[in-house]
Structures are given as C-alpha cells and as structure tokens.
Design a protein with these regions (language model features):
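Accessory "access/gating" subregions that flank catalytic or transport cores
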Residues: 45-194
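Mobile "lid/hinge" segments at catalytic clefts and subdomain interfaces of large enzymes
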Residues: 1-45, 53, 217-220
Length: 220
C-alpha cells in the first residue's frame, strides 16, 4: 500500500537525500515539493484549510496554556508555570482572543534577553495543556508538542511581523515532511528511541521549517 501511494506522488520521498535531489533537480524549495505531493491527495482548498486548522489549534493551545493558572491534574502538585511567565512578559495590554493576543505581542517591545523567555513560555503553555488533557497537535508526539508552535509563534510575533498564512503554511509543510522522513527511517517514539526520538525530531522539524521561512536553501 505504501509503495502504491509513493508511486502516485510526483516526488516520492523516503529519505532526506531524495528530498534534496528533487529540490535541486526541479529548482524548488522543500515546501513546494511537499505541496505538489499533497495535491495528489486533496484539493488546494483542502490543503489550505487543513494547514490553517493545524495552526489554529496550535495557537489556541498556546493561548489557553498562557492564561490558565493553578495546579496541574495528576496528584503530583505541579504548579503551572506558563501563566506567570506570560503575565510578567506581556503586562496589562488588552486583547480578547488568540489572534488579537498574537497582534498585541507583536506590538510589545521584546528585548533580546526576553526572546528565550517568550519561546519557553509558548512551549510550556502547550506542554501544560497536554498535561491537563487539553487538545494539542502531535508534532510529532504529545510529549514534544510544544516545540513547533513555540518556534512558529516566535517567528510570527518577534522575527517577522508581516508574516501571515503563506509563511505559516510553508513552515508546517516543511516541518511535516522532515518529521515524516524520521518516522519512515527511524522513530519518533520515546518508548523506542529515548527522549531524543521525540524532542530531537521536533527540534529538527522546527529547525528545517525555520530555515525555509528565513529564506535558507534546501541544502541548509
């Protein structure tokens, strides 16, 4: 069945060097290769809607995590940390939903020493939503679900205030392809490969996706 699916793709990819070879031969970026493959399975509208649905879920997850305080369920008396981190970073600026929140963060002056705090806050927020049985995007797993949304949010609110749906879709397509290569050739399961099989893969996915939106080459 897998061979049949790969055969229908214009650019069948099992390994990273195959992906790079297609990029070089076709003079395309990774997101463009992924997009052409996706079009064999769903319409352009479906691709657009599904990618933005993923991002909406990620954004909502960060929003909920940053605005929920108290003790996490489970009986270990673990206190939520994202709420206080976020409160100290954003101050008293007004907003009413995840998207107005994103715009407000864009308007704040983010000092260099605060960048890592913001990224950590976003990632912790997702982890805490996961720990409290909330909805997260497995990217590539529940345990490492905070990395992709945190890095993409960093890009949108700190690095590129003009970025929008185009960059979000490119980021997610590249991240997904890199995660898929790991899943085909190794594992994304911490139970099988140790913690680095989760956080290591999600970090590689985020790094490759960041390279795309920052204008890097497929080789990079």
């Amino acid at each position: 069945h897998k061979e049949e699916i790969l055969h229908t793709f214009p650019f069948p990819v099992e390994k990273a060097d195959e992906l790079l070879a297609f990029c070089v031969a076709e003079n395309k970026r990774i997101s463009e290769i992924v997009y052409e493959n996706e079009k064999t399975m769903r319409s352009e509208e479906e691709i657009h809607n599904e990618l933005l649905r993923i991002w909406d879920t990620m954004l909502e997850c960060m929003y909920i995590g940053c605005h929920s305080e108290g003790i996490l369920p489970g009986g270990l008396n673990v206190r939520r940390r994202a709420y206080d981190m976020h409160k100290n970073l954003i101050g008293v600026l007004p907003y009413e939903d995840p998207y107005s929140w994103l715009q407000i963060i864009r308007q704040t002056e983010v000092k260099f020493r605060q960048i890592l705090k913001w990224v950590s806050c976003f990632a912790l927020a997702v982890n805490e939503v996961n720990a409290s049985l909330g909805r997260v995007v497995t990217a590539p797993t529940n345990g490492s679900a905070g990395v992709i949304p945190a890095v993409l949010m960093y890009y949108l609110v700190i690095e590129n205030h003009k970025a929008g749906e185009k960059e979000i879709k490119q980021f997610l397509m590249v991240a997904g392809e890199i995660g898929s290569i790991f899943k085909k050739g190794a594992t994304i399961s911490a139970a099988m490969g140790g913690c680095q099989a989760e956080i290591g893969v999600s970090s590689a996915m985020a790094a490759a996706a960041s390279n795309q939106v920052f204008g890097g080459s497929p080789q990079q």
